[in-house]
A protein has these predicted regions:
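His/Asp/Glu-rich, glycine-adjacent segments
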Residues: 5
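Short, positively charged and aromatic/hydrophobic N-terminal segments
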Residues: 9, 16-24, 31
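N-terminal "arm"/small-domain region of PLP-dependent enzymes with the aminotransferase-like
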Residues: 28-97
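Conserved N-terminal alpha-helix of the aminotransferase class I/II PLP-enzyme fold
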Residues: 80-122
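Conserved PLP-enzyme active-site core in the AAT-like
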Residues: 34, 39-47, 51-53, 71-74, ...
């Protein structure tokens, strides 16, 4: 009990001081102060690569569209010239140190996170990475019954044990609602040693819960909070929207930038702001599940959409 009280005090102080720097409409944070959100490092690197007209002795095999002329004629040569492979001038998605590294810093800054990662396999990849980062085989994870199928995939891959919360049903309009404080407290009481709480916010019907209260409840019991924000990529950018996972102190979230943020289909983001989940663990999981041939077209679209 003493340990939990101490943990709760530390968490509340941590959230207070962090939120002094993370205010909706004033994106920032002392660690990333001064970042210019007008910059597009990945897109700029690709522009330089295309302008230099590099002779390709590397993949992809279509060679700037020469190998698929019918497709090139339809979509245009420029997009196929942008379809490049990892190299020093363009950076490497699996271990970024250049343009992608700078772009991901800007992304974290924009989303009020401590770190952020480009995803080219949708929020499905982000959801699975969150669960695998937070849970070991046998760990219990509390989640809503109406979670996306990617959540079930993450549970299978991690070996975690699901504990389901049945969301309330609005009989008038016939849809499931969000998770309530009471239902979460009940699930935690029955599973006090659960490792994480997984939430969908907003739901796929656009329903939002009192995320701030749910995060506070979970953290009070030393449980990490993971949030599927697939349909909430836009919510960080206007004060009239509900608070996001990063803004209320959740540990990780994944958002489909392609759904409501303007990037190309399949491109999403993974966001981390946690004292409970090590960044190195997240990187290890991503390196296990992430392609070694990330699309620069998709990453450039994330870069420009964030701007």
């Amino acid at each position: 009990m003493t340990k939990r009280i101490f943990f709760s005090i530390i968490h509340l102080l941590d959230c207070f001081f962090r939120n002094m720097f993370f205010i909706k409409g004033e994106v920032g944070g002392s660690k990333m102060a001064g970042l210019d959100q007008k910059k597009t490092p990945v897109l700029d690197a690709i522009k330089r690569y295309v302008d230099e007209n590099v002779v390709q002795f590397h993949v992809p095999g279509h060679k700037k569209g020469k190998g698929i002329p019918e497709f090139a004629e339809y979509v245009g040569k420029r997009v196929l010239q942008m379809d490049a492979n990892g190299m020093d001038d363009l950076d490497y998605a699996n271990n970024p140190t250049g343009a992608i590294y700078e772009a991901e810093k800007l992304l974290a800054h924009a989303y009020h996170a401590e770190s952020a990662y480009f995803l080219v396999n949708g929020t499905t990849a982000g959801v699975q990475a969150m669960i695998m980062s937070a849970c070991e085989p046998g760990d219990r994870i509390i989640l809503p019954r109406n979670a996306h199928k990617s959540t079930i995939g993450g549970i299978i891959l991690s070996g975690a044990v699901p504990v389901y919360i049945q969301p309330e049903i609005n009989e008038e309009i016939g849809i499931s609602m969000g998770i309530t404080e009471e239902s979460l407290k009940s699930a935690i009481k029955e599973n006090p040693h659960a490792k994480a709480v997984f939430l969908t916010n907003p739901t796929y019907y656009g329903i939002t819960s009192d995320l701030k209260s749910l995060v506070r409840i979970a953290h009070r019991h030393e449980m990490a909070v993971l949030v599927d924000e697939a349909h909430g990529a836009h919510m960080s950018f206007h004060g009239d929207f509900p608070l996001t996972a990063m803004e209320v102190g959740a540990d990780m979230s994944s958002a489909s930038m392609h759904k409501t943020g303007g990037s190309l289909t399949q491109s999403s983001v993974l966001l981390v702001r946690s004292n409970m989940i090590a960044t190195e663990k997240v990187k290890q999981v991503l390196n296990l599940t992430y392609t070694s041939s990330a699309s620069y077209i998709l990453m450039a679209s994330l870069d420009i959409a964030r701007k």
